[in-house]
Swiss-Prot record:
Lineage per the UniProt record: Bacteria, Pseudomonadati, Bacteroidota, Bacteroidia, Bacteroidales
UniProt GO molecular function: alpha-galactosidase activity
Top enzyme category: hydrolase
Annotated SMART domains: PbH1
InterPro entries per record: Beta-barrel_GLAA-B_II, Beta_helix, PbH1, Pectin_lyas_fold, Pectin_lyase_fold/virulence
Reactions catalysed according to its record: Hydrolysis of terminal, non-reducing branched (1->3)-alpha-D-galactosidic residues, producing free D-galactose; Hydrolysis of terminal, non-reducing alpha-D-galactose residues in alpha-D-galactosides, including galactose oligosaccharides, galactomannans and galactolipids
Described function: Alpha-galactosidase that specifically removes branched alpha-1,3-linked galactose residues present in blood group B antigens. Has no activity toward linear alpha-1,3-linked galactose residues.
Signal sequence annotation: 1-20
Superkingdom of origin organism: Bacteria
Organism: Bacteroides fragilis (strain ATCC 25285 / DSM 2151 / CCUG 4856 / JCM 11019 / LMG 10263 / NCTC 9343 / Onslow / VPI 2553 / EN-2)
Pfam families: Beta-barrel_GLAA-B_I, Beta-barrel_GLAA-B_II, Beta_helix
PbH1 repeats (start-end): 256-278, 312-334, 421-443, 444-466, 477-507, 517-547
Recorded family membership: Belongs to the glycosyl hydrolase 110 family. A subfamily.
Full protein name: Alpha-1,3-galactosidase A
E.C. numbers: 3.2.1.n1, 3.2.1.22
Length: 605
């Protein structure tokens, strides 16, 4: 027995060493990240992330405080990201990534209320090929957001005086104003104007006028312009100005699985927002996309706030808050590629068509696809992917498990990935301060949009498209429930039919016997609206609008010129019943075209 005793200490040391390698929590402060140091800690936090991957730690903890992150020392990596930039707008797809999580499983980043303060133009965090990652209770902001804010202070014929937000950096050069940031200058700008009296976000040419006018600084942060006499903007309104080039994104989740963002606060996102691309099972829990309350800013995103492209499994968005987007707060879709050439009986050459979406993996071996007629948006055949070969950034060759349909029209019809389509739940959210839509969603799987508030979205609060000739984003929906939501004064900037809810597929051939969308139910909602149009529906079968309340307000003057509450085009088996009108009752409630009388059942006379 004694001859084995000398082995025991060695075994104990081995066990202790192995146990040390599997510690549960890693602290960024142990790697030199110091809160409130205002020094660049990108390499220190990245080292802590890498340690989690090496040891299998379950928690990465950031003690409360502010941590500054600069591009210097950050990871640079090429990513092709959906809906971002063309080859001409941004030839390089290399992103500057603040924090990189690559092939990491079962990790919680516990923010403890800490703030990551970014500098320059950066993609704040990237998750690539991760599984079971959770980001919790973290704030993300930029020292100098790429969106500038300029408030009209005094306006007289020929002179306009403005106040620039303290986070907006500017310079007067040769009598003209320039906007710049930390390592960048704003060149190609898009402008949205905010009216605090009406709480509306409208398109504006105000920046074009100011930037072309002679300017002089009369005090720090106050600039006076010599403007045309007819230029008379409203004093107190604010211009939100940002560069149109989407060269970075707010946060990027690529080809990952089981990702949760909880109590994450995104106070500014440059380019595009939180982009989830070909990822399975994503939960957004109490995520807030809005400026810090103490910042005095209006803008939180240059474009979309949450963008889901080609995802699958479940997308759950619960109790989130969206305010200050210059595009859509939530956008869920896939990507249709056009069939260019038949290589052999089972192989097609396909092309990414939209300028801003290309280069990423759109198909994977084993995926089920549908062949889609662009003119009608019909899915007319299916197949399974056997092999994918990248030819160029725009072109891929895909081999299928069966012969390509003989009726496929090359250079017109498309191929849709049906596997990479998610179920979607959007519940208990608040949408406001956007010039565009609140929610865009196209997926053939189940969609529930329930108990949300849409407050003064500039265009339709909810838009359901299906597109194989414009953005090339997805095909028909089959199961959508819109229930228990409140819509308040939406669509003042327009949208399909100026309607609060718009169902607007891109099909050019409208035939009620060949509908695009199916089974859309709109029930128990309240619409408080200044204009008449509530529902615009095109090419939809099984449309139900039941037990909804419509209240006429006087917030804005009616702008649509459309006296109809409901406009149905090419729909089949539509039902409108149980509608309660409060206030003014329109004399002309329903307009139909390209459909038979029997295809609408209604209790409205």
């Amino acid at each position: 027995m004694k001859k084995y005793l000398h082995i025991l200490p060695a075994c104990f040391l081995f066990y202790a060493a192995a146990h040390a390698q599997q510690k549960d929590t890693v602290y960024v402060t142990d790697f030199g990240a110091v809160p409130y140091s205002y020094e660049n800690c990108v390499t220190q936090i990245q080292a802590a992330i890498d340690e989690c991957k090496r040891t299998g730690a379950k928690v990465l903890s950031l003690p409360e405080g502010r941590y500054d992150i600069w591009p210097e020392g950050a990871i640079r990596k090429e990513y092709y990201i959906s809906n971002t930039s063309t080859e001409q707008e941004c030839p390089s797809k290399v992103k500057t990534v603040g924090l990189m999580l690559h092939e990491i499983d079962d990790l919680t980043i516990e923010g403890n209320g800490a703030t990551l303060m970014y500098h320059g133009k950066m993609t704040t965090i990237a998750l690539e090929h991760c599984n079971g990652v959770r980001i919790n209770n973290l704030h993300i902001d930029f020292e100098r957001p790429a969106g500038s804010e300029i408030q009209y202070r005094k306006v007289t014929g020929g002179e306009t005086e403005v106040t620039l937000h303290r986070d907006t950096r500017y310079e007067i050069v040769n009598g003209k104003i320039r906007l710049y940031g930390e390592g960048w200058r704003s060149n190609r700008n898009h402008c949205i104007e905010y009216d605090p009296d009406t709480e509306s976000f409208t398109y504006s040419q105000g920046w074009n006028t100011l930037s072309a006018s002679d300017a002089r600084e009369i005090a720090p942060g106050i600039v006076r312009f010599n403007t045309p006499a007819e230029f008379m903007p409203k004093a107190g309104n604010t211009l939100t100005v940002r560069d149109i080039i989407r060269d970075q994104v707010g946060l990027f989740i690529l080809e990952s699985k089981n990702i949760t963002l909880s109590r994450l606060q995104m106070h500014y996102m440059h380019g595009l927002g939180i982009v989830s691309q070909y990822t399975e099972n994503i939960t957004m829990d109490r995520v807030k996309c809005a400026p810090r309350p103490d910042s005095g800013r209006l803008l939180a995103a240059s474009a979309d706030m949450m963008h889901f492209s080609g995802c699958k499994g479940k997308v759950i968005i619960d109790s989130c808050y969206f305010a200050g987007a210059q595009d859509d707060p939530v956008n869920v879709h896939g990507t249709n590629l056009r069939a260019l050439e038949k290589i052999d009986a089972q192989t097609l050459k396909l092309r990414f068509m939209h300028g801003q979406s290309y280069g990423f993996n759109a198909y994977f071996k084993g995926d089920t696809v549908a062949f889609v007629r662009a003119a009608t948006m019909e899915r007319f055949a299916s197949a399974t992917v056997r092999d994918v070969r990248r030819i160029s950034d725009r072109i891929v060759e895909v081999r299928f498990d069966r012969d390509i349909p003989t009726s496929l029209e090359l250079n017109h019809d498309c191929v849709e990935n049906m596997t990479c389509t998610p179920e979607v739940e959007i519940r208990n959210c608040y949408f406001t301060r956007t010039s565009t839509r609140g929610t865009l969603v196209t997926t053939p799987r189940k969609v529930v949009i329930e108990n949300n508030t849409y407050y003064k979205t500039g265009m339709s609060a909810i838009l359901i498209e299906a597109d194989a000739e414009g953005w090339y984003e997805s095909g028909p929906v089959k199961d959508v429930l819109i229930k228990g939501n409140t819509f308040i004064d939406c669509a003042y900037n327009g949208g399909p039919g100026h309607a609060v809810i718009a169902i607007h597929p891109s099909n050019k051939i409208i035939d009620a016997e060949r509908p695009v969308h199916q089974n859309i139910r709109i029930e128990d909602n309240t619409f408080r609206t200044f204009d008449y149009p509530v529902l615009y529906a095109k090419s939809t079968a099984g449309l139900l609008f039941r037990n909804n309340t419509i209240v006429r307000t006087e917030t804005f003057p009616a702008v649509s010129g459309n006296p109809y509450v409901f406009y149905l085009n090419g729909c089949k088996k539509a039902v409108i019943e149980g509608t309660v009108f409060e206030g003014e009752t329109p004399r002309q409630s329903i307009k139909t075209e390209n459909m038979k009388r029997k295809d609408l059942k209604t209790t409205i006379k």
